[in-house]
Design a protein with these regions (language model features):
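Generic secondary-structure signature for well-ordered alpha-helical cores
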Residues: 6, 10-13, 70-73, 157
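C-terminal extensions of enzymes
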Residues: 138-174
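Generic structural signal for well-ordered alpha-helices
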Residues: 1-9, 36, 65-66
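Generic detector of bulky aromatic hydrophobic side chains
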Residues: 4-7, 18, 31, 61, ...
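Glycine-rich phosphate/ribose-binding loops and adjacent secondary-structure elements
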Residues: 14-135, 139
Length: 174
């Protein structure tokens, strides 16, 4: 990881793209600290916390991320790789994480699950068949501003691939 980071940093000296150093170390604080310091020495645009979502418990993950974010500068983007459930996302945002990569909003959209403040609901449920309101009242996403819940349900049932884009947009916005 350190060799890759040095090589990548050298290649991207004059690039307009952002480059992130990846902090590794598993569950071991001393390895994470060493990795973070190596990445900080290279002065990246942001820092990714890698090696998560591979078997640690949620509390272990929070401890690892909290420890690592305390080392990383708060004025640079901090990105967690591979974590995607809503509870973890909210917990990690509270710890100072700015970015994530996950498929969860899209995956659940394909199954008709719609995120709202209470969690999510299943759009396939027949009770949404005639609902003329947006998916979430007050939501300012493109889908909610332009389409009713009943129309989104119609697309999901009759033209599912057409619905996924709109439902994913909504889920990401939430």
């Amino acid at each position: 990881t350190n060799t890759w980071a040095r090589n990548a940093r050298n290649v991207h000296q004059n690039s307009t793209q952002s480059l992130f150093g990846i902090v590794q170390g598993g569950k071991y604080k001393e390895l994470r600290e060493m990795s973070a310091k190596n990445m900080l020495d290279l002065d990246f645009n942001g820092y990714a916390i890698g090696g998560l979502a591979i078997g640690e418990t949620p509390s272990e993950r929070k401890e690892i991320v909290s420890f690592t974010t305390d080392i990383l500068p708060s004025d640079k983007l901090r990105y967690v790789m591979g974590v995607g459930d809503i509870k973890s996302l909210l917990d990690l945002i509270e710890l100072g994480i700015d970015m994530f990569d996950c498929v969860w909003p899209s995956r659940i959209a394909r199954h008709g699950k719609i995120i709202n403040r209470a969690g999510f609901f299943n759009l396939k449920n027949n009770k949404y068949k005639d609902l003329k309101e947006p998916l979430v009242i007050g939501c300012k996403c493109y889908t909610c501003l332009n389409y009713s819940t009943s129309y989104m349900r119609h697309l999901l049932i009759n033209e599912p691939t057409s619905s996924w884009q709109f439902l994913t947009l909504h889920n990401i916005f939430q």
